[in-house]
Regions:
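Amphipathic alpha-helical interface segments
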Residues: 3, 7, 81, 137-144
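Short hydrophobic clusters on alpha-helical segments that form packing/core surfaces
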Residues: 3-8, 16, 50, 54, ...
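Helix-turn-helix
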Residues: 7, 11-41, 45
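Short coil/turn segments at alpha/beta junctions that flank glycine-rich nucleotide-binding fingerprints
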Residues: 10-14, 85, 120
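Hydrophobic alpha-helical connector segments
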Residues: 45, 56-90, 94-99, 105-109, ...
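Amphipathic alpha-helical packing segments from all-alpha helical-bundle domains
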Residues: 96-146, 150-166
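C-terminal peripheral helix-coil segments that are non-catalytic and often amphipathic
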Residues: 112-115, 147-218
Length: 218
């Protein structure tokens, strides 16, 4: 896999032929077929491992004291990873019908960062809506930037990020939730710590608050 990763980074998927990978790894081509099925299986395994390593580094990074600053840094890191690994980005963003385990883990990290923001009362939409918008922005931004020459990319990622932040956050009043959606999202984010309610009551209240947050967003 290390040999395939090196060829991918150097020349993209076209450079990582089965023969080239076998030569670089010092093995026979049948070994690759036995382990990964075919070239596509090998490339998908490389992409999964590369993404998993990146997600693991994100999960282990100490969060910023301010949740919004932390969320902004996470968005920037995602775009930077995508631009630094264009071949991997193309593989992990290809339509497959189901996200890989590493991709799901990445969304879980994003979900935790959004939860921290919601707990401060600065989220003006539901957590689910915020996660979906941020995920779409990150993926779309990377794919759009990869289609542009490096010299024409300035500012696009920041503009896209701030447009989504403006739609999901109220950064001017960190101590007071913004409207009904903000209050519902803030309360829902803290339900796990509300020991006075039974699990069933917390689940019901979570569903009601989710509906309020989404209705207020429309």
């Amino acid at each position: 896999m290390a040999a395939a990763a090196g060829l991918l980074a150097a020349g993209g998927a076209d450079a990582a032929t089965t023969r080239a990978v076998a030569d670089a790894a010092g093995v026979q081509a049948p070994t690759i077929y036995r382990l990964f099925g075919d070239k596509q299986g090998l490339l998908e395994a490389v992409a999964e491992q590369t993404l998993a390593d990146y997600v693991d580094s994100k999960a282990r990074r100490l969060p910023e004291a301010d949740p919004v600053t932390d969320l902004r840094a996470g968005c920037d890191a995602h775009v930077a990873f995508g631009l630094a690994n264009p071949a991997i980005s193309a593989l992990i963003n290809a339509p497959q019908g189901r996200a890989s385990r590493a991709a799901q883990a990445g969304v879980s990290v994003l979900r935790e960062r959004v939860r921290r923001v919601a707990q401060t009362g600065r989220l003006r939409v539901s957590e689910e809506r915020a996660v979906d918008l941020l995920h779409a922005m990150g993926t779309g931004t990377v794919l759009a930037l990869l289609q542009k020459p490096a010299g024409e990319r300035d500012g696009l990622a920041e503009t896209a990020r701030e447009a989504v932040f403006a739609a999901i956050l109220d950064e001017q009043s960190p101590a007071v939730p913004s409207g009904m959606a903000g209050m519902a999202s803030a309360l829902r984010a803290g339900l796990d710590d509300l020991a006075v309610l039974t699990p069933g009551e917390r689940h019901l209240l979570s569903e009601l608050l989710h509906r309020i947050a989404n209705a207020s967003d429309r």
